Amino acid sequence: MLQIPVAKVAVLAATFAFDRPYTYKIPQPLTDTLRPGCRVMVPFSRGNRPCEGMVLALDQAQDDPRLKPITRQLDPEPILSPELIRLAIWMHDRFFCTIYDALHAILPAGVWYRVSTVYCAAPELDADAALALCGRSKQRRLALETVLAHGGRCPLETLQTAFGDKDPASALHWLVEQKLLTVEGAEKRVVRDKQLEYASLAVSLEEAQEEIRRRRRAPHQVAILELLCTIGRASADEVCQFTGAPKSSMKTLVRQELVRIDTEPYFRRPTHYTGQPKPIPALTAAQAEVFSGLQALLRSPDAQAALLFGVTGSGKTLVYLHLIEQALAAGQGAILLVPEISLTPQMIEAFSAYFGDAVAVLHSGLPLSERYDEWKRIRAGLARVVVGTRSAVFAPMENLGLLIIDEEQEDTYKSESTPRYHARDVAKFRCAQHRALLLLGSATPDVVSRYYAETGRYHYFTLPDRFNARKLPDVILADMKQELRNGNSGSISSVLYAELEENLRRGEQSILFLNRRGASKLVTCAECGATYSCPNCSVSLTYHQGNQMLVCHHCGYRQRVDDQCPVCGGELRFLGDGTERIEADVHALFPGVETLRMDADAIAMAGTHEALLQRFVRERIPIMIGTQMITKGLNFENVTLVGVLNADQSLYVGDYRANERTFSLITQVVGRSGRGDAPGRAVIQTFTPANETIRQAARQDYDAFYRSEIALRQLNGTPPFSEVLAVTVSGAQENAVVRCCAYIRDYFRQTIGERAEVLGPAPLPVVRMNNRYRYRVTLYCSQSREVRRAAANIVMYCNTEKSFRDVTVFADDNPLD
């Protein structure tokens, strides 16, 4: 039978239950240009709706009349490399997402098209006959009349507006089947490529000078020619701006073939270092020893993974710089991931100073155009060093040699929306594909990573001392129960007050850390006990003093606070401390002392993290009050005091990682102190000073913490001694959610009961969010294909089964909540 060229295509409209590569015919005009990694428009589903697709592979197949042809090719060149296509397919299997979900994570938003469906009247349509064919169906007649009223070409959105609350899909499908309408797709790029025009002489220098003598009555044209005779080539806009000539003068010279205009791609870039690259500082003996071991792994012909444990201020970044230098010298590229956008300005400044224009930055805070152009620079090989947050792990780097994840224990490397990937898992896959070195760095490594290093999965390196023999901060534990007994019910202990006073006297800076925004966590009535709760979520509202608003930090609901209790008219009390309340308390204790608050609300007002950080350094503001974004990676040489308020807050929650998160948080924030010449101090305020995790964090003793924590996890059978896989169900009706969860639990117990501990249904910590109830079934199991296949099967079944149509079901590896 005749073999024809076909393409395996991932289709945007395919849901997880129906997601697979679909086979399409390749029309003759596309056989020479179509390649894997190109996007196409294809007819999809029963109604042949135009839909975007990504070509995953080319093949030959027997001719079959049921095969649909590709409508058109959208990309002249592939936008995905074969490696990134393999990554998307792997993510589909690993993270329970569609291939297109993975593609949306891999590619920047600026590369996508806005695709709209357009319904067109068939050629030579007889309108009266067509309306007669519609019979008594009001919906078919309305759809046809709407298309005809718009000149025979009508977008789907317009038809949906005409139908109001009703769905036009059935009527449109019938009209297409009767060949009264045809369906087309119209696509528009989200971000367009920017081009710059450059002007140069199109004639010899002698001819240009002769033209100058002839054109004395055209001074603007003369000015343009004279400038180009002098400098040779320049931006057309700059030539007009410098000479004062209008663009019409330039166009006249181009038309007369005296000046030539060439276009070149222009890359919109974030602010970056523009000086000459400088040499990287020398390593200390301890750093050089670590670097030597890592350099050997970097040169290995096989993929390698290593964990670098270094106390805060030990100089891990300097080791990174030397490794990247080695990778570049070998013709390889490097990616460095940081956990927070707030860390990228410092990292970019440092790395650009040594590698110049070879550095690109990728994070969600960039404008779409800048992020798209940075992606293009990386893809074109113009940037060989990438610095960014979680999504930078997908940078289209060819010949990747080194991938570094700094502060690898941070939760921000895990995506909480589809696809629910962890950057560390993606990094392992990419390094395996490129035979590259994966380096995990941290002062408080993830317990699982440390276990893998101990058992030989990762190579292990340590920097146990601070750079240049600087001491770790001296830490004081402040017992807040004793403070209450002494009559101090404020947020600042007497110990911390004394240390702040001393720092102000010395002219040194301090940081106060509290992991909560707002002024007060809870507003309650002193008489009847009534509280303010979010109408959409099962949480209380947080009071923000600056605008006197009560805010839900889950759904964004806002309302003004009342002057008195809306239930009984009693006096309102504001309980709990937030960053705004701490700032007010500091001002009350130290009148006239300037403070800087760094949380999400303050950043929204300032515009960027960088603006606040620069103010803190430049103006030497005495006290910074911040949330979790100040706990890691930032380097302030004049900060000699750190105060940790409510250190117990993350300790007593229902999560097996509570100890680890608390230890890491305290250790990281304490590590911001004493990074300059002056010694550092830290005060940890706690209601449980005898707690072993608090005491280990105060001593900065990671090894002791790890030993106690790994023993506890082995006893409980939690990671790394098992894998956690959760299936979450959400819906507007709580009973429907619980019923679906119970079905999923029973399914797992019947199919994989002996290979997994099945728990649930259990509500999530915030059971109702945005008016949707959320319950979960959790598996503690060994990682296996059978368990993952069972999870994928039940997710697909529940999302297509009519009896569960009122709920949404998804699976997740090692969820954060």
What are these regions (language model features)?
Residues 15, 590-593, 748-757, 801-806:
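Short secondary-structure junctions
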Residues 35-36, 736-749:
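A short, contiguous, amphipathic alpha-helix enriched in charged residues
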Residues 182, 596, 752-764, 805-813:
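Short beta-strand elements
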Residues 275-284, 288-295, 301-738, 754, ...:
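Inter-lobe coupling/hinge segments of SF2-like helicase ATPases
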Residues 702-704, 710, 745-750, 784, ...:
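Surface-exposed amphipathic alpha-helical segments in non-transmembrane regions
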